[in-house]
Amino acid sequence: VRLYHDGLIYRGDYIVNWCPRCHTAISDLEVEFEEEAGALWDIRYPYVDGTGEIVVATTRPETMLGDTAVAVNPKDKRYKDVIGKKVILPLVNREIPIIADDYVTMDFGSGAVKITPACDPADFEISKRHNLEIIKIMDGSAVINENGGRSAGQDRYVARDNVLKDLERGGYLVRKEPYTHNVGKCYRCKTDIEPFV
């Protein structure tokens, strides 16, 4: 009790490595990373005021259903005038802000990234700094939940394919580039780990 009163422990949400097959949290030490060939997609997010758009880069387009912001580096001159503007989240039609955060790398993709606090540890930390909402879009089996709109009930990778088709149909998909990255795997069953709140 004293630790709680001293502010050393607290109760609250936290993001963990989650195995959707074993249905258990996995420590950082138990995650095995494998290099995989994937893709980097550029997606158009239109400004609410109709004056243009910002293009974000992502390796996980299916998680955009839970986006609560777009982030740019505060030193990036390309985006100086759009910090504080709002964009419309494609497919979901939710208004989200463009924020500035030093975590964003100016030379990765377009220099603008989507912030999905319930699906990425870095985004979770950014959400705490900027007091952003956390929208969970997956259940413990990595199936899209009711917050995922048309993708509800779909496995994360089925949802990815359908989200990409919907983005292309709506004119939001700008580009797809080959991209190699490390993917966390469960050390027991080798299933892709899902960051989970």
Predicted regions and their residues:
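NTP-handling and nucleic-acid-processing catalytic cores
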Residues: 1-141
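Core structural elements
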Residues: 1-2, 188-192
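Short, intrinsically disordered, charge-balanced linker/junction segments flanking boundaries
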Residues: 193-197
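Phosphate/diphosphate-binding loops
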Residues: 155-183
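Active-site cavity-forming subdomains of large catalytic enzyme subunits
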Residues: 142, 163, 185-187
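A glycine-rich phosphate-binding loop feature that marks nucleotide/adenosyl-phosphate handling sites
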Residues: 15-24, 179-189
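The substrate-binding groove and active-site-proximal loops of carbohydrate-active enzymes
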Residues: 112-114, 146-156
